Structure formats: structure tokens, C-alpha cells
Amino acid sequence: MTDSKYDLLFLCTGNSARSILGEYLLRKMAPLRFNAYSAGANPSGKVNPLVQRVLEEKFLINTDGARSKSWMEFKGFHFDFVITVCDHAKESCPIWPGQPIIAHWSSPDPAEFKGTDEEKIHQIYEVGLQIRRRIELLLSLPIEKMEKLKIEEHVSQIAFENQIASLH
């Protein structure tokens, strides 16, 4: 891997919640190291307003400009990393040019959360914390000094939080 900024795409089905969380958290956590993007296989057309509230109120991240978009907008783009955050996106993930590192970080779907808005906000926040922890682990990897196969192995293992200690 190079010393330049890495391009990372988070994918989920609707691009309304989990992939948006990943994109905006990574933008905040590593703006000098990564360009963060998100997209969906079948975009919902809007970002979940509770996800925006969580990002703004709990993580203190400005979400102006957040939008649900298709992965077709990125057709031909050469990503360094593609991370799917839902099982459907993993199954239908297209072939990306440039042989990016691909990993699957499955997370609960906020669209399926039940309860009041406040209960849903708490559940979405928990998903955000899970994604943030995985991003922290990604950022702790010495990517610039690792071979591609090792990077892919470690980035994939991040999804299994009980194996965190084995990453270093």
C-alpha cells in the first residue's frame, strides 16, 4: 500500500444507516488518512433521520450534504478498501476495479429496530459505537508497512471483536 490517502467505500443495501455511519465516522476520525464514501445496492433515496440525529448529537458530526446514493455512482472508481456492513450487500457486491481490499463488517439493521424514537436512537448509537470501534482497529493497523493479503486478513478479522487481540 502507498503512503497517500486511502479511498474507502462502505456499502449496505439502502445506504440510509450503517454505511452512512461508517462514512461519517471515518471522515471525522481520519480525514488526513482516508477519503470515506458510502453507497447502497438499492438506495432508499434518503438518510434515516434518526441516524443523522445520532451522528450530530452523540458523535458531534455535521451531516450536511448526507444523501443516500447508489454504488453505480462509483462505477469505475478505484477504491483501496470496500467494506460491506450488511449481509445483502456482501452477497451482491460488484467486482470493483483495482482489486480493493474487501471485508464484511456485519452490523444490526436500524430499519428493523422497534420502540420509541429514543429507544431507536439508543440502538443506532450502539451500532455507531460498534462501527467506530472497528474503524479504530482499522486505523491502528500499520497499513503502509503491510502486504495486501495481510491487510485483507486483518481488516476482515476486525468484524469479529472477540479476536481483537490477535490483530497485533
Residues of each region from the PLM?
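Short polar/charged helix/loop
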Residues: 1-168
